């Protein structure tokens, strides 16, 4: 029976430990894949499938990729949902006795990527770890590429909604979850349907309290609770420990880079539901999912990769502390008014490399010589950057300046050690600077002088053989060789040993040449090995300064974002908003930040807005389609959000009382895959608003009640307005409510705080012009037929529509909608539910209830209700 070759036995032994990953198995200058991995990789990567003798009767399917360009292939597999295990040769093949030793150096997953070629500069790459138990959750979001983790604990009745909100805040590319999370269908369904991330179900054993404590202690020390802010008995410790164990399993080394742990409370940030994030197009457009056309696109004038990531996180996480917001605004205002300093600051920032991610690769030992030299060049700019920030005479900027370490010792160390012309890889040497290490200089002298020796030998051999074109060459197969053309090969001495026949001549070696080769290659190999060692020592030295460099990187990133916001404000004539803890949203000549940029060269019509929790609580906005209602409502939400990230806003004047959340319901959308119509999707989203909004929220609702009968839709729309705007019946929060139900305009004067506004329209005959101005009062018409005409409907259709409209108006005169008399409706109300039943329901723990317990509970509930009705 056929037996596997030793190498294939080694391959299968390693593969047995990594069944779920595609194994990249290093052989020489290639990463090879075999058997099923080869079949998968050849299909997904369009690689040629070949075969290799493996000791069996049939050849093993095989394909491979060059080791120097493997990252692109790994990135493509990761994007398709695969994980990749990298198996390296862990000893020098030239010195190996028998089979070369190989081992897994890391497993690449979507959330553990650190290679710059596989990451996007302008966004963090988070891996999330969630631990859900008893209606509470511990969450950890870590970016392995920057070494930062954000942790929080959620304890509330609407736990699923809260977890989803946090997932949308960080957009993880990979999610680790405990088995208990499988019971929460709302979260798992949302991840599956709406998030393009990999999901890893962790074993229950990973969460054993003893193992959790060991994992945290190994990473952060015995005082891990004080070091990280993780509560000793909180749920976050389970999430963090599971993440650390996963990183140890996949990264093998470098997990120590994950040292910066930021504990936050979700209440620190404005709540933005997934629907709101999509409707406001904060970081990607609804159509095309592109950056252009988003708020991020408008504000991103940053100069560094670190700044780009921080700006994105600010937009994703607006603040709710007026003090913290005003600190940012103070810095932006200072830079807006100091044009020269701002320009100098931005100029310096352009030369700053990505210190955050570069430090991760340094700790992992994968930073290249060219990247490390770029770090020194960045350090060269830091003193000037500090000075520019200090010169602005702004306390907030001075505070940032103080956090920037000039890193002069690191700069000097790198400049002394690394050659300015260092290549991107260590493979061929040339990395260590002249004068840094005497042995390097000595070995180079041998190598360089050998070139002269070879030239002298070549000249002598030409004379001895009479062959003027004889030359000495080198390749990795034969080493050094003598090449003689066919015209002169008859003159070659017998002492020459033929090694290869070419069409144009012959290649030989001699004893003298082999001895010289041994000296040359020995020096070269020792030189390469020494440069490897010295460069690794340099990386360890730099890695030991992790905290200093990370603190500096964070300060530089924030300086970059503030300078970018100031630049945008100056270029676009933005104003500084007044931000406080009032309930005011007062905007004079507000503009939509994105539409205004898209319409560059055209006039954007500004509009005023006054909203508060008093007399201007709910603005009912009427007017025709295409007139600008949605743009107006979105611009107000965006202005409030911009103010709360610390940005100036597109307005002449602006006063924003901090809002704790923005909720939007804009536009029609079906969810056919879930069997939901436009109306069902709309009602689900409205229900989320009504359940989660507070009196400090800003609510934007557009065309509530479509997709059902007119009376049903109108009734729902009215009930929603009453619930949101009337504090005695519901929320009493600031609301913008656009509607085609003109009957709702009669609510002004009936419900306190409701005001009518409409989009001004100019009509000439059957033609209309949208003036884009918001004015007081209800619209006098919906202009639906005129809009249809603008859309290109045939004239015969619009003329017939006018005839039908006149007939309908004549037969169905408009009736005013009166305020509902709830007292009169009480006779139709359902009987009151007994209080003891309410108490039983409130005490019920649905999460732990078994099916049989649920049936028994319902039976008892029915008995109680029947007894109550009979009494």
Please place each PLM-identified region on the residue numbering.
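Charged catalytic and DNA/RNA-contacting regions of genome-maintenance
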Residues: 1-334, 350, 354-363, 367-459, ...
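Active-site phosphate-binding and catalytic loops of NTP-dependent enzymes
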Residues: 87, 110-119, 254, 390-396, ...
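Extended, charged helical/alpha-beta scaffold domains that provide interaction surfaces
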Residues: 455, 462-486
């Amino acid at each position: 029976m056929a037996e596997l070759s030793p190498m294939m036995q080694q391959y299968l032994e390693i593969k047995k430990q990594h069944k779920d990953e595609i194994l990249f198995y290093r052989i020489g200058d290639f990463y090879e894949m075999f058997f099923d991995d080869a079949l998968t990789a050849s299909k997904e990567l369009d690689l040629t499938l070949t075969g290799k003798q493996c000791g069996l009767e049939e050849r093993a399917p095989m394909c491979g990729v060059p080791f120097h360009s493997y990252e692109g292939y790994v990135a493509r597999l990761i994007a398709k949902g695969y994980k990749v295990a990298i198996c390296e040769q862990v000893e020098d093949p030239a010195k190996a006795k028998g089979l070369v030793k190989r081992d897994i150096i890391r497993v690449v997953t979507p959330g553990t990527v650190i290679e710059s070629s596989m990451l996007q500069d302008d966004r963090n790459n988070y891996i999330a770890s969630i631990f859900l138990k008893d209606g509470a959750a511990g969450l950890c979001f870590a970016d392995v590429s920057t070494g930062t983790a954000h942790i929080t604990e959620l304890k509330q009745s609407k736990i699923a909604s809260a977890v989803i909100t946090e997932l949308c805040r960080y957009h993880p590319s990979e999610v680790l979850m405990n088995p208990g999370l499988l019971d929460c269908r709302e979260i798992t369904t949302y991840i599956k349907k709406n998030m393009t991330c990999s999901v890893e179900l962790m074993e229950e054993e990973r969460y054993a309290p003893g193992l959790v404590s060991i994992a945290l202690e190994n990473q952060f020390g015995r005082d891990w609770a004080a070091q990280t802010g993780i509560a000793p008995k909180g749920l976050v410790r389970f999430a963090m420990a599971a993440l650390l164990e996963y990183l140890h399993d996949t990264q093998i080394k470098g997990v120590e880079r994950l040292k910066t742990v930021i504990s936050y409370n979700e209440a620190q940030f404005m709540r933005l539901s997934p629907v709101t994030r999509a409707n406001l197009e904060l970081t990607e457009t609804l159509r095309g999912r592109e950056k252009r056309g988003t708020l991020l696109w408008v504000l991103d004038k940053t100069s560094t990769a670190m700044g780009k990531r921080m700006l994105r996180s600010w937009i994703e996480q607006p603040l709710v502390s007026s003090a913290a917001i005003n600190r940012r605004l103070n810095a932006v205002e200072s830079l807006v008014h100091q044009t020269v300093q701002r320009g100098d600051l931005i100029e310096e920032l352009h030369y700053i490399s990505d210190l955050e991610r570069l430090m991760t690769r340094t700790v992992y030992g994968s930073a290249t010589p060219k990247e490390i030299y770029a770090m020194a060049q960045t350090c060269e700019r830091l003193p000037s950057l500090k000075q520019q920030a200090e010169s602005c005479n702004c306390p907030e900027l001075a505070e940032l300046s103080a956090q920037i370490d000039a890193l002069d010792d690191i700069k000097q160390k790198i400049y002394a050690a690394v050659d300015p012309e260092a290549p991107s890889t260590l493979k061929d040497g040339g990395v260590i600077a002249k004068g840094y290490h005497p042995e390097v200089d000595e070995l180079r002298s041998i190598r360089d002088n050998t070139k002269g020796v070879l030239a002298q030998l070549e000249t002598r051999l030409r004379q001895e053989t009479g062959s003027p074109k004889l030359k000495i060459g080198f390749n990795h197969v034969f080493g050094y060789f003598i090449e003689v053309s066919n015209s002169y090969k008859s003159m070659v001495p017998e002492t020459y040993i033929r090694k290869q026949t070419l069409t144009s001549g012959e290649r030989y070696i001699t004893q003298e040449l082999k001895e010289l080769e041994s000296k040359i290659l020995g020096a070269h190999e020792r030189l390469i090995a020494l440069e490897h060692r010295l460069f690794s020592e340099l990386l360890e030295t730099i890695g030991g300064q992790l905290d200093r460099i990370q603190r500096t990187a964070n300060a530089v990133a924030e300086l970059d974002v503030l300078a970018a916001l100031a630049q945008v404000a100056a270029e676009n004539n933005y104003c500084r908003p007044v931000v406080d803890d009032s309930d005011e949203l007062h905007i004079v000549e507000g503009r939509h930040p994105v539409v205004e940029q898209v319409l560059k060269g055209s006039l954007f019509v500004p509009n005023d807005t006054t909203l508060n929790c008093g007399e201007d609580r709910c603005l009912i906005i009427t007017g025709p389609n295409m007139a600008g209602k949605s743009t107006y409502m979105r611009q107000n939400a965006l202005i409030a959000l911009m103010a709360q990230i610390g940005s100036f806003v597109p307005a002449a004047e602006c006063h924003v009382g901090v809002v704790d959340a923005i909720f939007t319901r804009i536009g029609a959308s079906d969810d056919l895959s879930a069997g939901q119509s436009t109306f069902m999707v709309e009602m689900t989203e409205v229900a989320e608003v009504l359940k989660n909004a507070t009196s400090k929220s800003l609510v934007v609702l557009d065309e509530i009640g479509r997709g059902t009968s007119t009376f049903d839709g109108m009734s729902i729309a009215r009930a929603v307005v009453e619930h949101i705007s009337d504090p005695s019946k519901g929320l009493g929060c600031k609301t913008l409510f656009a509607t085609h139900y003109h009957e709702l305009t009669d609510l002004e004067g009936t419900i306190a705080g409701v005001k009518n506004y409409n989009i001004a329209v100019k009509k000439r005959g059957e033609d209309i012009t949208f003036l884009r101005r918001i004015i007081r009062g209800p619209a006098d018409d919906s202009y639906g037929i005129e809009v249809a005409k603008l859309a290109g409907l045939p004239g015969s259709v619009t003329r017939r529509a006018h005839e039908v409209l006149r007939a309908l108006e004549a037969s169905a005169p408009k009736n005013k909608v009166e305020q509902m008399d709830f007292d009169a409706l009480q006779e139709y109300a359902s009987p009151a539910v007994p209080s003891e039943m309410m108490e039983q329901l409130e005490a019920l723990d649905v999460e732990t209830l078994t099916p049989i317990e649920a049936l028994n509970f319902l039976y008892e509930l029915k008995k109680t209700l029947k007894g109550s009705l009979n009494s």
